[in-house]
Each structure stands twice: as structure tokens, then as C-alpha cells.
């Protein structure tokens, strides 16, 4: 053996250092020598120790012989070496290869402190296998580009130190970490692979992982790194696997894609530009801080539990389409996610968070999961579809901001609920056969088209929804929550009925004079309030047992034949009109509840019927030349004015109607059903005659001493009962063949010249008096039919 610290120098061509006959491994200091010299290892190991540096240009040979660099110095080998036993780096030293055969044919092995491997000639590629011993690190790189073509295996670590590029072209399997230093590049060449069991850390500014020349997709463990670093995918896909988590702040670029197949969390905090697909097979891909994905990268979550977490991002996020299976999750946090590109995507998982989703692509994004995000849903272009089993959050407002934008519910298998609906002309909501419910307290204006055979729209919120498009959905419109629905044209509510239930709602128009021809069904206990600022026409039949309220200052005109049985209320300053062909409902009581309230029948083309009439002073019923019949068994008090040239009032019901206003209608008053009419003043019955027919009725006064000067015509077979609690005067001529009955305890005084031929009956406790200028009818028999009955001619 030589001294372990003795440097060996083969100074001349032909010089030989032969350790083949040694029976033990040999150790020296450094090795130097010129080309043409030889070191013959035989099958022995030669260890180079010490701290010095050496350059050997000759040939190292030996079958089974190996070379170990155990010192911290630098050994440069430039010869064409043929030893087969391998090369070992153990002490942290540096081994520089001058040619592709500098390390013989055996493996390069690291252990202990490992060492550094570099090339003295740019572009040198070593084909040796590399075995990284557990706990050791092989540092590669330096100033010249180096290629490693052999397979790298073992549990040790690989460190890349530049500024050179180290290119891997072997199929690598090592499980230790991979660290790429500042200014250094680790590249994968043709046929090469990263190790799927190794994590990668780009630890310094300018560090680069370059996969652009790889000829197959690449897989590694977690990816970490700071700002100013780069991963260049080229056209390749990089898969991050394993159980570890990583945070990468650099930029991933290229036309390739990124796949997450590990169980940990990969966090990206850089502005990534790669345009290939982002695939999450398992684990969590998180965007945090100033990080982002490429706006054109489609995202696919392929397995239950896969998660795309945007909650830590500091800004809105954009991707291409999103696809995925049930059980996967996109967590928006409070961020907005914009889906772009021209492709189509179907996502069956849950999009969650307080953020929103924006559709800006030209394709179709179909959601088949039960999504819970509560931010806005915005469709700038393309189609957002809800598929089988899918739904949006019940509180997300939906806005279609571009012509051609489509919200397609036709494939949904359950009714859908959102917040408000907004959008521009040229956009479309396709209901198919589904119901869309708009909830919440917000307001929206939708100028596009709502279509769908059998589809319906429900306003369940308390806000205002304005529809200005020519809508074609056929399933009807429902008001249930007390909100307001504003129609911008006659087709705004499609072709189906307008239905109310629950809290009902308000119906108005944004364009004065709009007429809706939809049938209206007023559900039991609900109220439809109509009117608002602009005049509105209702041409369809209003049916049901619910109520109708008119709230101005506009005029609501009915041109349909209505049958509803709930109450009709006309508010302060409001007008309910009946137009040509229209009709009030005979089963609805009408209440003019505020000063300035008007019931206008002047344009009606047929006689009108309603229930009892009520109202306050200052309100008006304008009969025009039409007849108004009050039916039913209910009672009403009307303190306003009934006007109308030629218009008449008929009490056909069995209830009591009290009129206290100064009425001016001229067409007369008719009692036909046995009900009671109470006059509150002498002009309460207008200027026309009081006529009885059929069951006749009762005439009285609510103010004692009132005298009515209206002529009275008692129809054949009918009876007019007069009297009641208060004294009443009848100053007009009573004619006809019908009967007059006086029913007290009050006094009824006749001051007209009467000619009727029917019977006169005075009930018990009642008084019929004849006043100044008055006369009994000579053709009428008088019967004092009860005790206390009085006929008083003394006045």
C-alpha cells in the first residue's frame, strides 16, 4: 500500500500505476497524470483522499475495479476510462468528468457526505447509472452543461447547482429530494424521466425545471419553490404525486398540463401561464396569495375527494372549462371564478364558498352537482346549463351580460331556485319543462327571452323583478312571496297563467298602456296587487278565491271576463277600470279604500256585477252609461260618489248596501233581490227612479229625516219595504203595480202624488204618514197589519 495522503502523479506517457496485484483496497491522495499514462485497478478499489485537487488525463482500467473520491478536493478525469466497478463519492468532494466515459462503465454511487459531479467539457453526457445512498446528496451542475443518461436510483438526494443545465435522459427512480438552486436548470431530455418518488424544490431565484424536451409525461412528488423560479412544461404534462404537500411561488409555463395525483396539498402562489389541462385526481390543488392558474387551462377533478381550493387567493381566478365527478369540490372562498375557453365542461361536484362563478367562454358548462356558492352567477357568453341532479344556490343572483349568453335549465331534473335574474336583450333563459324560482330581497331586470314548453317562473322573494323581453315559456308565472313583478310588454309573462299563493305579490308594468292577456288565478288567502306608476291592462280571466288590490296612481283596466270570489280593494288615488269586453267579478266585494280611489265602468260594453260595494268619502264610482249590479249576501257602506249619465245601480243581493255620498248617476236604482238599501242623504240614489222587480227589497235611511225625491216604480209582483229605524220621506211619485210595505218602528212620510195599484201594508209599530202635498194612491188597498200600525193623515 501507499501512504493514504500521498498524491500520485503519472507525469509521462507510458507511465503506469498498477494496483491490480494488491490484496487490499488502496488509498492515496490526489491522482494526476498525462494522457497516455495508465492506472490499472484490476479488481481493487482506489480511494482518493485528502484535500488537494488533481487532474488525470490518462486511462483508468480494471475489471471490477472501482474509484472512490473520499476527500473534499476536486478530481478531474479526462481520459477514456474502462474500469467497471463503479465510482463512489463519499466525502463531499467534486468529481469533474472530461468525457462521457470518464467514470468507466460502472455506476456512480454516493454515500456519507456524497459529493459534486460536473463536466469540464460543455455538453458531456454520462451514461453511468447513479445510486444515491440514503442520507447522501449528489450535487450536479457547475459551469458546464451536463447530461445524465443513466438511471438514478436510491434513497439519497439530488441537488442541481448552476449556472449550467443538467439534463436527465434516463428513467429515474430515486426517492430522495430534488433541489434546484438559484440560476440552475434541471432539464429532462428525450427518453428521460423525473423520479415519481422525489419531491422537487426550486430553491433560488432563476432556478428552472425544464421539461420541454421530454418525450413523455413526467411525474414527481410535491413541488416547492420561491418567486423568480420557473417550470417549463413545453407540451408535456407534469404529475405531482405522493403524500407530501408543497408550495410553489414560481411560474409554471408551457402548453402542457399539470396533474395532481397525491394525497397532500399543492399550493400555487405564482402567476402560472401553462395552457394545458389542470387535472386533480386526488388531494388538493390550492391557489393562494397572488397565485393564479392560466385563464385558458381547463380544470378536471376526476375523483371524489379531489379539491380545487381558491379560498386563499388574493384576486379573482380564471380557468378554462371545469369538469369533474360527484364528491369533488371547488372551494371559492370569497373569490370569483371565471370559466373561459371554447370547450365544453360537465361538473358534478360542489362549487362552494361566498364567491361567484362567471361564464365567459363560447362553449357550454354543465353543472350536475348541488352547488352551494352564494356569490353572483354571471354569464358573459356561452351557455351555463344545469343538468340532471344539478342546482345552483338558492341565493345566487344570475346575470346574463352578453347577447347570446344562455342559462339553460332544460336538462335539470328538479325545480331550480336562484336569487334575482338580470340580463341584456339577446340573452336567453331556457326553462325547458322546469320551474325557476327567484328568491331573496334583491331586484333584477331581465331584457332577454325566457323560453320553455311547460316551464314556469316563480317570484318567491320580496324584491322587484322586471321582465322586458318577449317571453315564450308556457308553464305560467307564480307570485308567492310578496315581491313585485314588472312587465315590460304584453308577452313578458309568456303564455301561461299568472298564479298567486301565499303572500302573493304585486304586478305592474314599466311601459304605460301594456296589456297582459294571461289568465290570472288568485289562490286562496293570497292577494295580487296591481297598478304602480304606469297604466296596466289585464285581458285574461281572473279566477280563484284570492283577492285583488289596485294600488295607483295608475289605472288598471280589466278587459277579461272575471270570476274570482275574493275581495277587490282600490287604494288611494288608484283607478280600476273595466274596458270593452271586460267584466267585474260578480262574486267579489269591491272596496274603494282611499280618497281618490276610482271604479270606472264608463268604457265597459256590458252591464257589470260585483258583490257588496264599500268605500270612503272622496272615492268615485263612474258608471258612465252602464248598469252596476251589487249581488251576494254581503253588506257594504259606500261614502263616495256614484256618477254616470244613464248609469244605473241594482241591488240584487240579500245584504244591506248603505250609500252616504252625493250621488249623481241618472239611470236609476233597482231593488230586485230582497236586499236592503239605506240612503245617507237625499241624493244618495242619484237622480233616476227607484225601481223594484222580482223579490224587490227594503229602502231606508241611515240619517233620520232624510227625504228622497226620486220617483219610484213598483214592478208587478214585487214589494218595496220602507222604513227601518230612522224616519224617511218619499217625495217622488210612486207608480206601478207592485206593493208598498212599511216596516218601522220609524215613520215613512209620503209627499208625492202616488199612483201605484199594488197593496199598501203597514206593519206593527210602523207609521205611514202623508205629508204636505202628498197623497195616498187611490188604487191601492191599505192594510194596517200589526198592533201599533198607524196611518197618519194629519200632517
Task: Give each language-model segment a name.
Residues 17, 29, 44-46, 209, ...:
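Extracellular beta-helix/beta-solenoid repeat scaffolds
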Residues 40-44, 50, 104, 132-133, ...:
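Solvent-exposed beta-strand/loop surfaces, strongest in extracytoplasmic domains of secreted
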Amino acid at each position: 500500500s501507499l501512504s493514504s495522503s500521498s498524491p500520485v502523479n503519472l507525469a509521462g506517457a507510458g507511465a503506469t500505476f498498477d494496483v491490480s496485484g494488491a490484496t487490499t483496497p488502496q488509498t492515496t491522495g490526489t491522482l494526476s497524470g498525462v494522457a497516455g499514462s495508465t492506472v490499472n485497478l484490476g479488481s481493487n478499489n482506489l480511494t482518493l483522499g485528502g484535500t488537494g485537487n488533481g487532474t488525470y488525463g490518462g486511462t483508468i482500467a480494471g475489471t471490477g475495479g472501482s474509484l472512490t473520491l473520499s476527500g473534499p478536493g476536486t478530481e478531474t478525469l479526462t481520459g477514456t476510462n474502462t474500469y467497471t466497478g463503479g465510482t463512489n463519492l463519499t466525502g463531499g468532494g467534486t468529481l469533474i468528468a472530461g468525457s462521457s466515459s470518464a467514470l468507466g462503465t460502472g455506476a456512480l454511487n454516493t454515500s456519507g457526505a456524497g459529493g459534486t459531479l460536473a463536466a469540464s467539457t460543455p455538453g458531456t453526457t454520462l451514461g453511468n447509472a447513479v445510486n444515491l445512498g440514503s442520507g447522501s446528496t449528489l450535487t450536479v451542475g457547475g459551469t458546464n452543461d451536463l447530461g445524465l443518461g443513466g438511471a438514478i436510483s436510491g434513497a439519497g438526494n439530488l441537488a442541481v447547482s448552476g449556472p449550467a443545465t443538467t439534463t436527465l435522459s434516463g428513467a429515474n427512480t430515486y426517492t430522495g429530494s430534488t433541489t434546484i438552486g438559484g440560476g440552475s436548470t434541471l432539464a429532462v431530455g428525450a427518453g428521460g424521466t423525473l423520479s415519481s418518488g422525489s419531491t422537487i424544490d426550486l430553491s433560488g431565484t432563476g432556478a428552472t425545471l425544464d421539461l420541454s424536451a421530454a418525450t413523455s409525461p413526467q411525474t414527481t412528488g410535491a413541488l416547492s419553490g420561491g418567486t423568480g423560479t420557473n417550470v417549463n412544461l413545453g407540451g408535456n404534462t407534469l404529475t405531482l404525486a405522493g403524500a407530501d404537500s408543497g408550495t410553489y411561488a414560481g411560474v409554471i409555463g408551457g402548453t402542457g398540463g399539470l396533474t395532481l395525483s397525491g394525497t397532500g396539498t399543492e399550493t400555487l402562489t405564482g402567476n402560472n401561464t401553462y395552457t394545458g389541462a389542470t387535472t386533480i385526481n386526488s388531494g388538493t390543488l390550492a391557489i393562494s396569495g397572488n397565485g393564479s392558474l392560466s385563464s385558458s387551462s381547463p380544470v378536471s377533478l376526476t375523483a371524489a375527494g379531489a379539491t380545487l381550493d381558491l379560498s386563499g387567493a388574493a384576486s379573482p381566478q380564471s380557468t378554462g372549462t371545469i369538469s369533474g365527478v360527484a364528491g369533488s369540490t371547488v372551494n371559492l372562498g370569497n373569490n370569483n371564478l371565471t370559466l373561459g375557453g371554447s370547450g365544453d365542461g360537465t361538473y358534478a361536484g360542489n362549487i362552494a364558498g361566498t364567491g361567484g362563478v362567471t361564464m365567459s367562454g363560447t362553449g357550454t358548462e354543465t353543472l350536475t352537482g348541488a352547488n352551494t356558492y352564494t356569490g353572483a352567477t354571471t354569464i358573459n357568453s356561452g351557455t351555463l346549463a344545469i343538468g340532471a341532479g344539478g342546482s345552483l344556490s338558492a341565493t345566487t343572483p344570475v346575470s346574463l351580460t352578453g347577447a347570446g349568453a344562455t342559462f339553460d335549465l332544460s336538462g335539470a331534473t328538479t325545480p331550480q331556485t336562484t336569487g334575482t335574474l338580470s340580463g341584456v336583450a339577446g340573452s336567453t333563459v331556457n326553462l325547458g319543462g322546469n320551474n325557476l324560482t327567484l328568491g331573496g330581497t334583491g331586484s333584477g331586470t331581465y331584457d332577454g327571452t325566457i323560453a320553455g314548453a311547460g316551464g314556469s317562473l316563480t317570484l318567491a322573494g320580496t324584491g322587484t323583478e322586471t321582465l322586458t323581453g318577449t317571453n315564450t315559456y308556457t308553464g305560467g308565472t307564480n307570485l308567492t312571496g310578496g315581491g313585485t313583478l314588472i312587465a315590460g310588454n304584453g308577452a313578458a309573462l309568456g303564455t301561461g297563467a299568472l298564479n298567486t299563493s301565499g303572500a302573493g305579490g304585486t304586478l305592474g308594468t314599466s311601459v304605460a298602456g301594456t296589456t297582459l292577456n294571461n289568465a290570472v288565478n288568485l289562490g286562496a288567502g293570497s292577494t295580487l296587487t296591481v297598478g304602480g306608476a304606469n297604466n296596466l291592462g289585464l285581458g285574461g280571466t281572473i279566477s280563484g278565491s284570492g283577492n285583488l288590490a289596485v294600488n295607483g296612481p295608475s289605472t288598471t283596466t280589466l278587459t277579461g271576463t272575471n270570476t274570482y270570489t275574493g275581495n277587490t280593494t282600490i287604494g288611494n288615488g288608484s283607478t280600476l277600470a273595466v274596458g270593452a269586453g271586460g267584466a267585474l267579478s260578480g262574486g267579489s266585494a269591491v272596496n274603494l279604500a282611499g280618497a281618490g280611489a276610482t271604479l270606472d265602468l264608463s268604457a265597459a260594453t256590458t252591464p257589470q256585477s260585483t258583490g257588496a260595494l264599500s268605500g270612503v268619502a272622496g272615492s268615485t264610482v263612474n258608471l258612465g252609461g252602464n248598469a252596476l249590479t251589487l249581488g251576494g249576501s254581503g253588506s257594504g257602506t259606500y261614502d263616495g260618489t256614484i256618477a254616470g249619465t244613464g248609469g244605473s245601480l241594482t241591488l240584487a243581493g240579500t245584504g244591506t248596501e248603505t250609500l252616504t255620498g252625493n250621488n249623481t248617476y241618472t239611470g236609476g236604482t233597482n231593488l230586485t233581490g230582497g236586499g236592503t238599501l239605506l240612503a245617507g242623504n237625499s241624493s244618495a240614489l242619484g237622480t233616476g227612479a227607484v225601481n223594484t222587480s222580482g223579490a224587490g227589497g227594503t229602502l231606508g235611511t241611515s240619517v233620520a229625516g232624510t227625504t228622497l225625491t226620486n220617483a219610484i216604480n213598483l214592478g208587478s209582483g214585487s214589494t218595496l219595504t220602507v222604513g227601518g229605524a230612522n224616519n224617511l220621506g218619499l217625495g217622488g211619485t210612486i207608480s206601478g203595480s207592485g206593493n208598498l210595505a212599511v216596516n218601522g218602528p220609524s215613520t215613512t212620510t209620503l209627499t208625492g202624488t202616488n199612483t201605484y195599484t199594488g197593496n199598501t201594508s203597514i206593519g206593527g209599530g210602523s207609521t205611514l204618514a202623508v205629508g204636505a202635498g202628498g197623497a195616498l194612491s187611490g188604487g191601492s188597498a191599505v192594510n194596517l197589519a200589526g198592533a201599533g200600525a198607524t196611518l197618519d193623515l194629519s200632517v
